[in-house]
């Protein structure tokens, strides 16, 4: 008789492990969404800078390691924009903004994709929670049957 109860407990334990794995997956996806949103914010800042800075303006240029140097913009007519894959291209201000806007659109698509993944994980979670509830009800019924048999 204890085999039936133990099997149910094992099923519950397996379901709990699957639920934990799904929760971790959901958290990882949410973290990736935050990273993508941060990247979008950086793009917005770059677009704003391109649109507002003028030749002769003084800016702080990051050197890395939280070190900056003051620099004077000599020419806002040409902006270097990364294209991906380690490549960059020189564009006029308008072309640079267009390039950055396309990057943002790609990131929007990625966010939609990730939100779809979260939806799938949530559906799987709901399904597992339903299975857990059913397994728990089965365990309760088995326990009640064992108690009735003992009486």
UniProtKB/Swiss-Prot annotation:
Coiled coil ranges: none
Family (UniProt): Belongs to the prefoldin subunit alpha family.
Natural source organism: Natronomonas pharaonis (strain ATCC 35678 / DSM 2160 / CIP 103997 / JCM 8858 / NBRC 14720 / NCIMB 2260 / Gabara) (Halobacterium pharaonis)
A GO CC annotation given for this chain: cytoplasm
InterPro entries found in the cross-reference section: PFD_alpha_archaea, Prefoldin, Prefoldin_subunit_alpha
Protein name as annotated: Prefoldin subunit alpha
Biological processes per GO annotation: protein folding
Subunit organization: Heterohexamer of two alpha and four beta subunits.
Biased composition (Low complexity): 133-151
Gene Ontology molecular function, alphabetical: unfolded protein binding
Listed Pfam families: Prefoldin
Keyword terms, alphabetized: Chaperone, Cytoplasm
Disulfide bonds: none
Role: Molecular chaperone capable of stabilizing a range of proteins. Seems to fulfill an ATP-independent, HSP70-like function in archaeal de novo protein folding.
Cited HAMAP family: PfdA
UniProt-annotated stretches for the region Disordered: 120-151
């Amino acid at each position: 008789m204890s085999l039936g109860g133990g099997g149910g407990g094992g099923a519950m334990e397996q379901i709990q492990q699957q639920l934990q794995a799904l929760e971790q997956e959901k958290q990882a996806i949410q973290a990736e969404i935050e990273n993508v949103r941060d990247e979008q914010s950086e793009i917005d800042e770059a677009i704003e800078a391109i649109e507002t800075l003028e030749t002769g303006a003084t800016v702080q240029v990051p050197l890395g390691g939280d070190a900056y140097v003051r620099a004077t913009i000599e020419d806002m007519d040409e902006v270097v924009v990364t294209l991906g894959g380690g490549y960059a291209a020189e564009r006029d201000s308008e072309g640079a903004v267009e390039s950055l806007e396309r990057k943002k659109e790609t990131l929007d698509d990625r966010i939609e994709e990730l939100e779809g993944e979260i939806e799938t994980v949530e559906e799987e979670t709901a399904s597992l929670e339903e299975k857990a509830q059913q397994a728990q009800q089965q365990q309760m019924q088995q326990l009640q049957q064992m108690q009735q048999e003992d009486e």
